[in-house]
Amino acid sequence: MKTPTAAEIRELFQRYFEEHGHRRVASSSLVPQNDPTLLFTNAGMVQFKDVFTGRERRDYSRATTAQKCVRAGGKHNDLENVGFTARHHTFFEMMGNFSFGDYFKADAIAWAWELVTSPAWLGIAKDRLAATVFAGEGTLPWDEEAFELWKAQGVPVERIHKLGAKDNFWAMGDTGPCGPCSELHYFQGNDVPCAEEQAGRKCQGVACDCDRWLEIWNLVFMQFERGQDGGLTPLPKPSIDTGAGLERLAAVAQGKRSNYDTDLFRSIIHAVEGLSDKRYDAASDDGVSMRVIADHARATTFLVGDGVLPSNEGRGYVLRRIMRRAIRHGKRLGLERPFLAAVCGAVIDEMGAAYPETRENRAFIEKVAQQEEESFRRTLDKGLAILEGEMRKLVPDATHDGKPATPAPDRARPIIDGKVAFQLYDTFGFPLDLTRVIAAERGFDVDEQGFDRHMAEQRARSEWKGSGEQGVDDLHKQIAGELGEVKFLGYELPAARAQVKAILANGARVARAGKGDKVEIVTDATPFYGESGGQVGDVGHITGAGLEIRVDDAQRPVPGLVTHVGEVLRGEVAVGDAVELSVDDRRRDLVRANHSATHLLQLALREVLGEHVKQAGSVVAPDYLRFDFSHFQPVTEEELAAVERRVNELVRENAETETAVLKLEEARHAGAMMIFGEKYGDVVRVVRIGPSKELCGGTHVRRSGDIAFFKIGSEESIASGVRRLVAYTGARAVEVQQREAEELRRAAALLKAGALEVSQKIEQTQRRVKDLERALEEARSKAAAAQSGDLAALAKDVGGAKVLAARVEGDGKALRELADKLRDRLGKGVVALGAEQDGKAILLVAVTRDLTARLKAGDLVKEAAKLVGGSGGGKPDMAQAGGSDPAGLEKALEKVAELAARALA
């Protein structure tokens, strides 16, 4: 049988289950939707979580996927092991088949066995396979059914192993669906090292942590519901959730002991070889670094492709840790120039056919990688210098590279101060684990509790409130599961009749509500648009017999559910009532115009700035629109003008807005724009306005001319590689334009110029200011030269050198210039100058270079600064300090003279 490629295995797996009645479902984003409990998608079942719990309904009961997954950060974290083992990854693909109350154990086991062993499919040798089943634990019964089913497939009894709940019982949480699981393991051979045997104990076989028996597929049988009391109730419709890692299956099918030796990684590692001019040797330190880079480039490519950007919090921080770990391993390979973008390119070459979105976003992914690496490299050497300086303080006999001499066996490892580790994180972007690894390599530990304390203090100072990822109300999920999707009528109607299906008040479901109650009303249908996709929710009224509810907002807390948030102004509302729902159509018109303008804006930005521009967030409100987009430098005034001009051209074309409901793949092939990391269903709505074509569920104008006028208000950076633009439409845009014109008229009047001459007049004024500054500088320099001659005469001879301490007039710059001139005049000596400016003390100390081995300016100024209530530092030959108490200047200067005299005597 021909050895299959990983791409063939991925296709073969999904095709097998398609032939057995499963719907092939595309991988969801690595950023989980509506699941704040997860940092990243880490299993195939994540996108089906609400389907398994009954809170979401789909038009199929069997599914198969190849799901993008990341395990790095949080509970599921493989980061530290990556590169050092044959099978750990931050990014991996989890293939799976799922049954939502359809088939159960018999089919799941039979299909798994056939797919793995049949020569028509994977053709893996049966005599190298073993199965595990749940052995039972406490009140949980053993899974005799699974045991008999494996036996019926021909698996010998001695190769069906019973394991406890730790290995073979799965639960979604403390409560909810759970059940036994069953694993398929592949025997790699007794020559695979086992730590148990090396310690003189027996290898535990399938239960051992060694790689002799490699788990390749896990079948979860969801057959119980665990209640609050811990009791188990059989589910009326048991379900199946399975997961088979593509990387492991590829290694087994290709006869490789390491995932990194498969074709999934071969081309990526080959790219690293080419960049480093080194050959891959799996057993060497360089081999570890190449594996780290290959794995982390995959994670970087797919995380950035799903809209995650490097930052100092949340998901962005995990990505930054991954990227910077890869960059550091690149430096260990001798890669002194940025390389990560090129390796990400190799990942896209390898995986772009399976994940076309990586090809579409290639330029953006590579740019983010390049920018992050350049940023980190700028600070890496500075941070390492600080870390090595700290190591030398702790171990004075350290070598030149900061590596301490071998400590005595009973000597405790020296500890890097948590404050230093935090400074490296806060100032130089060193993730804590990077500091930990560098320290460990050189025989040091890190005070992680101290680091955490400083981190907590910083968050308190900046009133840090967390990532904002708050839990989704279980009541909303419960209602959505009971009622199904609320029908949206707002594309055609501003008002409609509907029936009240649920009422929430004070965080609880109630049967009725009366005047003054703050409520959330759920109806079976609604013309109200629930906030989503950046578009704010509608406002309006709900009325009925003697009833009036003011709707202040419409929300979409979970997919398919719209809640009307407001206050009962009159009468009473009860579940089952027939009501009239009316949207504030005038406000909706303003929102429509801003939403359609947002689509045209994205098109114009891509035309003017380039295809790398992607939406990174938006707000569509009645009075403005805000658009966040990927771009790596400030947008110039000329570019902004071109964007604004292009949008207004499209407005004047008065193109009709067209909508179509298409299958996701049809929309993709039609060239519709999609949003980074957005979760789309199998069927999507495409909105076309002239040349603009986007996937969108929002409300829009009938023709582009209804926007009337478009005006950009501001543009700024909000994160690395992300810009924010605020704009206006219609009457609000005219108002902004008029306000700007009025400001221009005022500026012209102040400058005594015409409106079209303002910039010219400002340039003239700037040139005049520069000329005056230059003249002032020359006068100051002459004054300093004259003053230096007078002051030099006051210097005292100490041990063959001159010491001068004097109070003068001037700012910090003037003191530096004067100190330079005095130092030159003295030839060999120490200069200390002090001045008062704006009620503060300024101190400056300069030491001639031939004396810096005996005394340092930084040490002198630190001591003196204490006497003026301040602090300072600098280089050995010049240092500066500031303080809040200028009354102490005389004593501070005397202190410098005293310390200098003592050192020189």
From Swiss-Prot:
One Gene Ontology biological process: negative regulation of DNA-templated transcription
GO molecular function, one term: zinc ion binding
Domain of life where this protein originates: Bacteria
Cited InterPro entries: aa-tRNA-synth_II/BPL/LPL, Ala-tRNA-lgiase_IIc, Ala-tRNA-ligase_IIc_anticod-bd, Ala-tRNA-synth_IIc_core, Ala-tRNA-synth_IIc_N, Ala-tRNA_ligase, Ala_tRNA_ligase_euk/bac, DHHA1_dom
PROSITE patterns (alphabetical): AA_TRNA_LIGASE_II_ALA (PS50860)
Localization per Swiss-Prot or TrEMBL: Cytoplasm
A GO cellular component annotation in the UniProt record: cytosol
Co-factor: note: Binds 1 zinc ion per subunit.
Domain description: Consists of three domains; the N-terminal catalytic domain, the editing domain and the C-terminal C-Ala domain. The editing domain removes incorrectly charged amino acids, while the C-Ala domain, along with tRNA(Ala), serves as a bridge to cooperatively bring together the editing and aminoacylation centers thus stimulating deacylation of misacylated tRNAs.
Record-stated family: Belongs to the class-II aminoacyl-tRNA synthetase family.
PANTHER family: ALANINE--TRNA LIGASE, CYTOPLASMIC, ALANYL-TRNA SYNTHETASE
UniProt-recorded name of the protein: Alanine--tRNA ligase
Name of the encoding gene: alaS
